[in-house]
Structure formats: C-alpha cells, structure tokens
C-alpha cells in the first residue's frame, strides 16, 4: 500500500541507533520517490517532543490499524461483528466488586481485568465499538458475549480463569498478566509489570514475539500479516 505524508505508521524493527523499538508509532513527514521509495518519519515522546526523525524504507514500516479499521475489515470479510458493550454494563464490570464467595485466585483475576480496563483506555475503547471479535484466525476476547445463556468460549473472564486457576497446569509465564486474545500459534497478553501488550509463543510462552506500548500498535502487528 502506498503511503503518504501525515500517515501514521508502525516501526517493524528495532532501530537501536535511534533509540527506537519495534512497534513504535511514527508519522510520515516527507515521501521520497527517487532513486528509491523512502520516508522521513517523525517519532515523538508522550509529550509530543520529537525524539527521532530517520529516513526509512517501506519494509521497515507497517500500516497503522485501529479497532474501527478492524471492524471495517470484518464487515468486508463477512465476519460476525458483536455489538458494543452497553455503557452501564461496562461501568459495572469496571467498578463492581467481585462476589465475596469467590476464592482469592478468582478474585485476583477479576480485579486484574478491571485494572486493565481502567488503566488502559486505549484497550477498553474497543468495547465501545464492538465486544471483541474474530478475524482470520485472530481472536480478541469479549466481555459479555454469550451462547445459550452462558459466557462465550472467548469471554475474557473465562479464558483467564482457565489460564490462572487450573488444577492440571498453570503457566508461570502468564501469572500476573491478562490474556486478551490469541492466534493459532500465539497468545496475546497485557503485562502489568512492563505496561505493554505482548504477543507470546503459545507453546513456549516465555518467548515474547513482539511487545507494544500502545494497543493500536499491537493491532497493527496482528492485522497486517493477515489483511
């Protein structure tokens, strides 16, 4: 896809000399077409101050996707699109105390999911647009979707209860993290320790395939290979 000035892009590799890591968001400020295609890309810190402005080639960049872009792709591909979560239900899920009869481990999972929704509005905003979704082998877990009156298999509470409260095996690499989705060969998690969204190998979950500061950066990494 041809890129233009002011397009937001995602860095697809580490640039140690620039102090930039894979997944960092930048803005194209100039396009070069000769002798080969290249882009002058501005990267800023959280305060909007420029921290680097390298010239990059197309292979070093990925397209930038948002939840609305994903929803459009799902509609175009005839994938089912769940309704957004009702604002009142969302407020309850974010602030209501877990049932007192729950065991401590279950309460901790519930509270971690609440903490994620509160502390990362970039992620929580997805549920104002659609309640999770499945697209070409990728699943983002839902909050309230149900099947025959029971939470769907992709319910984020169900998936995390299964991951962290399991009599057979509890993956030590996922303790203290919230699993927010999966692909065929990977799990998608949020790490409170690093305050980052991660794509981890499903079999060897100690291996972090990619790590992203922003949820939309994570989306861009997940969607571009399959879009």
Q: Which stretches of residues belong to each language-model region?
A:
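Basic/aromatic-rich interaction segments and small domains that mediate binding to polyanionic partners
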Residues: 3-62
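Catalytic Cys-His active-site segments of thiol-dependent hydrolases/isopeptidases
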Residues: 42, 198-203
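Glycine-centered tight beta-turn/hairpin loop motif at sheet-sheet or coil-to-beta transitions
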Residues: 48, 185, 204-206
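Local beta-strand/beta-hairpin segments that build beta-sheet-rich folds
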Residues: 51, 180, 208-212
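Short, surface-exposed secondary-structure junctions/capping segments
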Residues: 64-68, 222-227
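A surface-exposed partner-binding patch
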Residues: 66-187
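Short acidic-glycine loop/turn motifs at beta-strand connectors
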Residues: 191-194
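Compact, glycine/acidic-enriched structural inserts
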Residues: 201, 205-226
């Amino acid at each position: 896809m041809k890129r233009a000035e002011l397009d937001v892009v995602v860095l697809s590799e580490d640039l140690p000399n620039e102090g930039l890591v894979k997944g960092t968001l930048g803005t194209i400020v100039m396009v070069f077409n000769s002798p080969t295609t290249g882009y002058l890309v501005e990267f800023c810190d959280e305060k909007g101050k420029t921290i680097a402005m390298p010239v990059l080639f197309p292979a070093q960049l990925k397209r930038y996707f948002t939840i609305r872009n994903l929803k459009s792709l799902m509609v175009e591909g005839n994938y089912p699109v769940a309704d957004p979560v009702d604002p009142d239900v969302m407020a309850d899920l974010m602030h209501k105390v877990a049932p007192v009869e729950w065991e401590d481990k279950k309460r901790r999972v519930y509270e971690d999911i609440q903490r994620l929704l509160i502390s990362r509005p970039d992620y929580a905003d997805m549920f104002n647009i659609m309640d999770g979704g499945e697209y070409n082998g990728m699943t983002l877990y839902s909050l309230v979707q149900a099947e025959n009156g029971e939470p769907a298999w992709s319910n984020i509470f169900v998936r995390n209860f299964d991951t962290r409260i399991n009599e057979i095996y509890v993956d030590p690499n996922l303790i203290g993290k919230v699993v927010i989705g999966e692909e065929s060969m990977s799990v998608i998690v949020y790490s409170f320790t690093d305050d980052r969204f991660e794509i981890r190998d499903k079999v060897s979950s100690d291996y972090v395939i990619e790590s992203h500061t922003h949820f939309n950066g994570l989306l861009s990494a997940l969607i571009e290979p399959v879009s």
